Amino acid sequence: MDGFHWTDIVSSMPPSIPPVEIIEQPKQRGMRFRYKCEGRSAGSIPGERSTDTSKTHPTIKINNYQGPARIRISLVTKDSPHKPHPHELVGKDCKDGYYEAELSPDRSIHSFQNLGIQCVKKREVEDAVAHRIRTNNNPFNVSPEELKADYDLNTVCLCFQVFIPDQAAGRMLPLPFVVSQPIYDNRAPNTAELKICRVNKNSGSCLGGDEIFLLCDKVQKEDIEVIFGLGNWEARGIFSQADVHRQVAIVFRTPAFQDTKIRQSVKVQMQLRRPSDKEVSEPMEFQYLPDEGDPHHIDEKRKRTLDNFKHYVKNNPFAGGETRPQRRIAVANRNVPTKSEPIRPSIPVPNPVVSCLPFSMPVLKAENVTSPSTLLSTVNISDFSNLGFSSQPPSQSDHDRLESMLNYPSFPGDANLDLVEMLPHENESRCTSLSSIDNSDFSQLLSESQSSGTLSAALQEPGTSQGTFMAYPESIARLMTNRPNEDEGGERIDSGLINGMFDISREEIHLTSLFELDFSSLLSNMK
């Protein structure tokens, strides 16, 4: 049978030969051609009406005939003259790139399953075509010169050749062969099935200009367009090749609708179309909306008032509640009970600073002191009578002047108070009349107190039963002498000052607390 020339047989066929009809065309798109090196099945060619739930395959019908028959199916090019294609059919009953089998005599309709397409590489095209000629797989007897032309490796057609027995001639009579519609490789972008997968929105203004993001299967940026159509009206989406992203996404702007004065929304069809072969995708619905005339809602914004805004904020479920009160920081307050006794002036006490004195005085207890260098338990005010101190407190004007100048607290009049209670308090008055004190005397006093021998000599003088604590400088003695008299209504400062400072007979006092005062700060404030 391979030695027959089909053109001679077809030309000599009688007019009563039954025709062959393709009643189920192969599906044009959706199938992928497989290379032989992939090592897997090439699949099965589906029918045109095949779905996921109902599978169909290419089907033919031999009209006006029912009986034994033989069929050969091969691959040819889509353009006329149909040349043998270098690709091969693979599957059951396939050899040398074509399918051949006996048909059942009990029926006239025949369906073909398990037919796959196996593609060849470009460098193997010439060898594959030469093999078709050697195996007499050239249904249209194309000349060798025409076989050297280029081949479209992404498109093939099925050629059905049916043979029935001729009882008179004793041979197989070929029936007129038929060629199916093209089958495209789904892997190639220029022949693949067009499909819109998703869009970011499916409505826009009738004036056009809305930006749409469209996701699709692989397309070629130079061979694709987006079509909007309704009846006889058609318009293309506006985009350039740069707006096609990696062959799977297109960003375009919608065209204006044919009637920009519509008062109701209009639904149109949106499709992908390939200009090279006029292939289109399944349509997707797009809705044109009437023009509102105010795209930025300026008129609506002008109508908004402050009351409307407050009402909106109040009813908004995401609106915040009442304004939070200002956050307050808790600060610890030291509540010191104030004394009801009248406030008496005292010596200024500076703010505590780091002392630079090179010595540290020991803590002495009055009841355990037996050596001559210990402190006296009490100091009588009569000891200071020889110094010429006045018993009168300073006048109110002098007291106010001292308080405004030094801002140091005074000691209360209680002679038994501790030195801790003599620290500055908020409501205590200040002693501020030390302007006559010579700063050099304080410096001398500070230098003299640094030696323990001098301190011991100052604590007690030999030959006296009640000595003074130390020899006061001349300027301090002069200040004490110039105090107002007690007859003027003032209070005595000597008793509260001296006894409050040196009364250590009743409780334990640290001697070092007096010398740790920062005299440098005091001197700098009085300058």
Swiss-Prot record:
Residues covered by the RHD domain: 18-306
InterPro entries in alphabetical order: Ig-like_fold, Ig_E-set, IPT_dom, IPT_NFkappaB, NFkB/Dor, p53-like_TF_DNA-bd_sf, RelA_RHD_N, RHD_CS
Pfam families hit by this protein: RHD_dimer, RHD_DNA_bind
GO biological process, one term: positive regulation of canonical NF-kappaB signal transduction
GO molecular function list: DNA binding; DNA-binding transcription factor activity, RNA polymerase II-specific; RNA polymerase II cis-regulatory region sequence-specific DNA binding
Tissue: Predominantly in the animal hemisphere of the oocyte; all tissues of early embryo.
Motif (9aaTAD): 513-521
Compartments in which it is found: Nucleus; Cytoplasm
Protein name: Putative transcription factor p65 homolog
Source species of the chain: Xenopus laevis (African clawed frog)
Encoding gene, per UniProt annotation: rela
